[in-house]
Amino acid sequence: NLGAHVIDQAVQLFGVPEAIFADIDIIRTGGLVDDYFVIHLLRPSKAPHVKVTLKSSYLMCEPEPRFVLHGTEGSFVKYGLDRQEADLNEGLMPGTANWGVEDESIWGLLHTEKDGNIVRHKYPSLAGDYAGFYDNIHRHLRLSEPLLTDAAGVLPVIRLIEAAWESSKEGKVVKIGK
């Protein structure tokens, strides 16, 4: 489940890649389901010169950054997950004060240099709003408003997941069909 969301986020940001290379495995003793992956999206359509690496494991004792971007003029690093699930588990409801608002300790950090000086600035994420997804479906069904997300949008992600499994099994780069 987590892998599908990470792949979808990468496709939304960078586009569908020309090819994929993946290492997917069960690394827990006695494990029955994949619990580790590293996936490289090669030459994504919206940013063909960007190197996209996705990774996750259930066995991480220390958090890794959720997002890391490096460019010629700086880097951006972001830790932490969306707060909404944790908020629900703590009894908060959508629309209440601080719903989906992350702690400052996991704000994104932008590191740049200006006039030879290092400039580091923290940026909060926007508060999450999963309920907006369902509100949009309601408005679509009742008022014929357009859907913000359509079912066809999942097809590239499904194709990438299948190609990632093939790549991992065969140990090779797999081209993505159009």
Where do the model's predicted regions map?
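Short, conserved clusters of charged catalytic residues that mark active-site
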Residues: H5, P146-T149, R159
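Residue-level signal for well-ordered alpha-helical scaffold segments within enzymatic catalytic domains
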Residues: Q9-Q12, N136-H140, A163
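Residues at helix-coil transition
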Residues: G15, R139-L143, K169
